[in-house]
Amino acid sequence: MMKHMHIKIKKLHSHAVIPSYQTPQAAGFDLHAVEDSLIKARDRGLVGTGLAFEIESGFEVQVRPRSGLALHNGVSVLNTPGTIDSDYRGEIKVILINHSNEDFHIHRGDRIAQAVVSEVTQAVFTEVQELGQSVRGERGFGSSGVARKGHYQGKPLA
């Protein structure tokens, strides 16, 4: 069963579009550009939505790319996922990056990103002198390879 939480929305501009889900089971809702803009080839830009959110405490909204923009236009969200904290009250803006060799024109009302509501868990930090051992240890940055899943150094993981 789908969970729900309430987001209060303030329109900061008359052309702002209130978000909605496109299908009954959609996880993400679309964010729309509030005005025309241009992102030059191989450049980035900040695109406003003309909206401000009041998100319930204990939740965040994650801003993510739209797959169609990425596939068909080479345009994505630069800092993905972008986080909108529950205590932020300013305009929701999206940093888009144009990976293509052609300028990308954004028209008022275009869907520029999608957003997903997520519950927040805050960590409690404890400084220690030593960390527990693990199979992986300090190996990172591609050390697990790209082939054969479930193996470590050529041996199956138990």
Curated annotation (Swiss-Prot):
<dbReference type="GO" id="GO:0004170">
    <property type="term" value="F:dUTP diphosphatase activity"/>
</dbReference>
<protein>
    <recommendedName>
        <fullName>Deoxyuridine 5'-triphosphate nucleotidohydrolase</fullName>
        <ecNumber>3.6.1.23</ecNumber>
    </recommendedName>
</protein>
<feature type="binding site">
    <location>
        <position position="79"/>
    </location>
    <ligand>
        <name>substrate</name>
    </ligand>
</feature>
<feature type="binding site">
    <location>
        <position position="93"/>
    </location>
    <ligand>
        <name>substrate</name>
    </ligand>
</feature>
<keyword id="KW-0479">Metal-binding</keyword>
<dbReference type="InterPro" id="IPR036157">
    <property type="entry name" value="dUTPase-like_sf"/>
</dbReference>
<comment type="pathway">
    <text>Pyrimidine metabolism; dUMP biosynthesis; dUMP from dCTP (dUTP route): step 2/2.</text>
</comment>
<dbReference type="Pfam" id="PF00692">
    <property type="entry name" value="dUTPase"/>
</dbReference>
<feature type="region of interest" description="Disordered">
    <location>
        <begin position="139"/>
        <end position="158"/>
    </location>
</feature>
<dbReference type="GO" id="GO:0006226">
    <property type="term" value="P:dUMP biosynthetic process"/>
</dbReference>
<keyword id="KW-0460">Magnesium</keyword>
<dbReference type="GO" id="GO:0046081">
    <property type="term" value="P:dUTP catabolic process"/>
</dbReference>
<keyword id="KW-0546">Nucleotide metabolism</keyword>
<dbReference type="GO" id="GO:0000287">
    <property type="term" value="F:magnesium ion binding"/>
</dbReference>
<feature type="binding site">
    <location>
        <begin position="83"/>
        <end position="85"/>
    </location>
    <ligand>
        <name>substrate</name>
    </ligand>
</feature>
<comment type="function">
    <text>This enzyme is involved in nucleotide metabolism: it produces dUMP, the immediate precursor of thymidine nucleotides and it decreases the intracellular concentration of dUTP so that uracil cannot be incorporated into DNA.</text>
</comment>
<feature type="binding site">
    <location>
        <begin position="66"/>
        <end position="68"/>
    </location>
    <ligand>
        <name>substrate</name>
    </ligand>
</feature>
<dbReference type="InterPro" id="IPR029054">
    <property type="entry name" value="dUTPase-like"/>
</dbReference>
<comment type="similarity">
    <text>Belongs to the dUTPase family.</text>
</comment>
<dbReference type="InterPro" id="IPR008181">
    <property type="entry name" value="dUTPase"/>
</dbReference>
<dbReference type="InterPro" id="IPR033704">
    <property type="entry name" value="dUTPase_trimeric"/>
</dbReference>
<keyword id="KW-0378">Hydrolase</keyword>
